[in-house]
Amino acid sequence: PIIKGINKGAGLNGIHVINCDPHSDMRPMLGRHSGNGFLYAYSEGYLKKYAVFGLHESYNIYSALELFEQHKEQLHFETYDDIFVREQISYQLALNNCLHFCKGAACGVEIDLDSIQNVPVSARTPSGMLPIDVRKYVYHCGSELEVCYLHIAEGAPVLAHKQMDNKTGKLVAYIITDFVKAVKRNIR
């Protein structure tokens, strides 16, 4: 709904999106928007280019990865495994690849908090980016792209099996502050 709303509200004909997320959210379109929201936006023409930064290889189905392979001009990813596990590409080069891919049009910035290690979310991960990695990501996105929105997804500071965790709110505040500073710097 965000991508469609930006297009319609701003009179655009497709935007780019960069997403820091272990999941591509490009699962088959089987009805409900769960794990397939970006595929709906792409199929409907609202999403022209899509880059995923920090994709976890084992969290994505084959058909989604195959779609990226078949549509390299519009779809790109850099994996968490290549960056942090195998160290085949540096963090900065992987991020630069995604940023370069998304330049040239209005761009949405997405952050799924389940990309960050041990943050209380519905799909909490013991193996993810550190908060500083995501803060750098959002800062570079805000300062280098023609940003049209920021969406922070999946925060769940209160889960049925957990006590209230105010660290999630603090982390989100850091992310928003870094983003605002970067966009402000980019406008100058």
Task: Give each language-model segment a name.
Residues 1-188:
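Conserved alpha-helical scaffold segments that buttress catalytic/binding sites
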